[in-house]
From Swiss-Prot:
This is Glutamate--tRNA ligase 1. Monomer. Gene3D superfamilies: 1.10.10.350, HUPs (3.40.50.620). Transmembrane segments: none annotated. It comes from Rickettsia prowazekii (strain Madrid E).
Length: 447
């Protein structure tokens, strides 16, 4: 049986966003599910926009999500191989030189669209005479190269979308080599997939037409194409997610929103599938439940709120031993198990625990100055002598007996005086963490 080999091929022209991290996760999970191999490839043929900084950022984000690769390479290191295949395809008459300028091509495109025609290249360069070609060369024009597509029907079975068919006549011969000699994504990707024995490619449905073209490239090189799966796109406010839409970068979700790695991994591994989105504690458990057949053909809606809610669910499921290392990472290794268990139910992000530590062990900032001072003074006198886990219940019952207060009128002034916040962890759990004298001091300082 052929070993499964998948790949993730980002362009280092920006930071990873939720759309392409989803592609990375699913390719990695598919490989691991089948005891296969996962390759990280950098499609850096865009010399102007590709940056080493973005390569470093991509690797950092993948490592953060526990996506480890078995092999990595970048396309710029393989230029000689691409030119070898270029010459082979020219000899096979599947690549041909074109001499139109960008302006001429744009004019052709506009004319076709104005007539209600699809913007398909007319193959005019195939009819150039030697004299015309020589004239272009003398003008200083350098050729770009297109792949010659067969007009035969193209079809394949997609692991998500099922049978897909294309009429070759509806596709335009793609430019595979620019006039400056640099290579575009289309052919380079096919050559890499052949040389690295890629067996399965999982990517967004915006690549479906590319797949139709690339299948012909595989066939032109006498190779069997990989198995394809095209994911429905992630939609947010009617927009497709891309690196040009701000706020969706993994670095942003990690640093600004405060999401845990397994929150992001769990969410985007299951988003768009029929499986329940559950906050898994380890990437290995995600591998065990992963099924590519569970993914839907329909567009997938992503909302940041759903991620934040899942992050909360993950945090409240973690035992202290499971979170100790993460506490060290955020410089909160002073947190002990008792404190963790007390505040855990109300954490939206892990760093919130530092705020609650400050609430318990530093004087809170009281924003509401309209508290009933006499009530707080009276409450301070009713505080039990020994503070235990039952003290809050005993204390508030006694306050009710003496003052007649109930509900919000009873609880909110006490919470504000003790924590400076209108909501948060159960005071029953927080109270034993604060020294009795400090509790009285906070009540009296307002009263």
């Amino acid at each position: 049986m052929t070993k499964v080999i998948t790949r993730f091929a980002p362009s280092p022209t920006g930071m990873l966003h939720v759309g392409n991290i989803r592609v990375a996760l699913l390719n990695w999970l598919y490989a691991k599910k089948h005891n296969g191999k996962f390759i990280l490839r950098f499609d850096d043929t865009d010399l102007e926009r590709s940056k080493q900084k973005y390569k470093n950022d991509i690797e950092r984000d993948l490592k953060f999500l526990n996506i480890n690769w078995d092999q990595t390479f970048n396309q710029l290191s393989r230029v000689s191989r691409y030119h070898e295949i270029k010459n082979l395809l020219i000899n096979k008459k599947r690549l041909y030189a074109c001499y139109e300028t960008k302006e001429e091509l744009e004019l052709k495109r506009k004319l076709q669209l104005s007539k209600g025609l699809p913007p398909i290249y007319d193959r005019a360069s195939l009819n150039l005479t030697e004299k015309q070609i020589q004239k272009y060369i003398e003008q200083g024009r350098k050729p770009h190269y297109r792949f010659f597509l067969s007009y035969e029907p193209i079809s394949w079975f997609d692991m998500i979308k099922g049978e897909i068919k294309y009429d070759g006549k509806t596709l335009s011969d793609p430019i595979v080599i620019r006039a400056d000699g640099s290579m575009t994504y289309m052919l380079c990707s096919v050559i890499d997939d052949i040389d690295y024995d890629i067996t399965h490619i999982i990517r967004g449905e915006d690549h479906v037409s590319n797949t139709a073209i690339q299948i012909q490239m595989f066939e032109a090189l006498n190779k069997i194409p990989p198995v394809f799966a095209h994911l429905s796109l992630i939609i947010n406010k009617e927009e497709k997610i891309s690196k040009r839409v701000g706020g969706f970068e993994i670095a942003y979700l990690k640093k600004e929103v405060g999401l845990e790695a397994m929150t992001i991994a769990s969410f985007f591994s299951l988003l768009g599938s029929s499986l329940h989105i559950f906050p898994y504690k380890s990437i290995e458990k995600l591998v065990a439940q992963f099924e590519i057949s569970s993914f839907s053909k329909s567009p997938t809606i992503y909302q940041q709120y759903d991620l934040e809610r899942l992050n909360h669910k993950l945090l409240i499921s973690l035992d202290f031993n499971e979170v100790k290392e993460r506490l060290k990472e955020i410089d909160a290794d002073y947190i002990d198990e008792n404190f963790w268990l007390s505040v855990r139910p109300n954490l939206q992000k892990l760093s919130d625990i530092k705020d609650w530590w400050d609430i318990c062990y530093q004087t809170p900032k009281i924003k509401n100055l309209n508290l009933d001072k006499e009530y707080l003074k009276q409450a301070s006198k009713l505080l039990p002598l020994k503070i235990t886990k039952d003290s809050w219940s005993i204390w508030t019952k006694e306050i009710t007996n003496i003052t007649g207060r109930k509900g919000k009128e009873l609880f909110l002034p006490l919470r504000l005086a003790l924590t400076g916040r209108e909501s948060g962890p159960e005071i029953a759990g927080i109270l034993p963490l604060i020294d009795r004298e400090e509790i009285i001091r906070r009540l009296i300082s307002i009263a």
